[in-house]
């Protein structure tokens, strides 16, 4: 039996497990009538498994809609932290009419690929505000790299040095950790004495705690993840999909 067949069979079984007891509880049916209805229902579903598939598709659609509404409520409740926290890096137009928030991990392969998408949006869209949030979910090395990134942000109010650091570390090969992150920071000419001091400050821990708290509220557990307007986008969906979300947020349709 193929995986598809197994899936349909399991769905049929689950449907019948729910439906048959309900039929059995119908007092107006005789025992013989109940048995006949059960047989007809079972035979129909086995003969037409696409009904189960359609039902599953509709269930997925409703679940997606429910998730979207939940995300909208969560984003509204946490809007200040998501879009305007003083503990975040802002690139592009700080007064942009759409804010594009990315949660990333320096050891995330998909984030490495998605970086070009963010950079293209940054270059091509003068009305876009881009917010970067460190979200180190891939182990100790990721946490160390994120901590250094926060310290970089603390001595760079313009975001220019942070972006340079971000591109070099995320775009580099191999595992990102404290040693590599510090090497990149030194290479781009940052004040290393201040960086080490900032790295030991409470601000670094507070920043990452804030990022994790809002990510948890949004139900995020992987990277890259995005908040665009009142929408959550999970995964490296590609430049065109991100553009469509930005345009929909800006003017209500995929193409402005």
PLM regions and their residue ranges:
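N-terminal targeting signals for export/organelle localization
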Residues: 2-5, 10, 18-79
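Extracytoplasmic/secreted proteins, especially bacterial periplasmic and envelope-associated proteins
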Residues: 36, 40, 47, 51-54, ...
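Short pre-active-site segment immediately N-terminal to redox-active cysteine/selenocysteine motifs
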Residues: 104-107, 222
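A short beta-strand-turn-helix
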Residues: 80-98
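Structural alpha/beta surface segment adjacent to cysteine/selenocysteine redox centers
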Residues: 101, 112-186, 216-221, 252, ...
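Solvent-exposed coil/turn segments that connect beta secondary-structure elements
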Residues: 105-106, 135-136, 231, 238
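The canonical Cys-X-X-Cys-His
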Residues: 108-112, 225-227
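C-terminal cap of thioredoxin/glutaredoxin-like
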Residues: 4-5, 27-42, 62, 183-256
């Amino acid at each position: 039996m193929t995986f598809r067949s197994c899936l349909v069979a399991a769905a049929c079984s689950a449907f019948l497990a729910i439906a048959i007891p309900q039929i059995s509880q119908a007092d107006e049916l005789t025992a013989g009538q109940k048995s006949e209805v059960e047989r007809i229902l079972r035979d129909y579903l086995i003969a037409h498994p696409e009904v189960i598939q359609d039902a599953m598709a509709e269930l997925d659609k409703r679940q997606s809609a429910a998730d979207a509404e939940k995300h909208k409520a969560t984003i509204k409740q946490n809007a200040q932290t998501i879009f305007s926290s003083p503990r975040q890096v802002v690139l592009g137009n700080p007064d942009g009419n759409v804010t594009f928030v990315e949660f990333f991990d320096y050891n995330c392969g998909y984030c490495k690929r998605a970086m070009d998408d963010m950079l293209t949006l940054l270059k091509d869209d003068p009305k876009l505000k881009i917010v970067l949030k460190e979200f180190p979910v891939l182990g100790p090395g990721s946490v160390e790299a994120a901590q250094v990134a926060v310290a970089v942000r603390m001595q760079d109010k313009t975001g220019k040095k942070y972006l340079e650091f971000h591109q070099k570390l995320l775009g580099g090969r191999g595992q990102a950790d404290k040693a590599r992150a510090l090497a990149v920071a030194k290479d781009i000419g940052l004040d290393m004495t201040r960086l080490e001091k900032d790295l030991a400050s409470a601000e670094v821990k507070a920043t990452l705690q804030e990022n994790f708290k809002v990510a948890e509220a949004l139900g995020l557990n992987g990277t890259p993840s995005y908040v665009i307007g009142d929408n959550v986008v999970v995964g490296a969906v590609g430049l065109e999909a991100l553009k469509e979300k930005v345009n929909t947020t800006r003017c209500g349709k995929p193409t402005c």
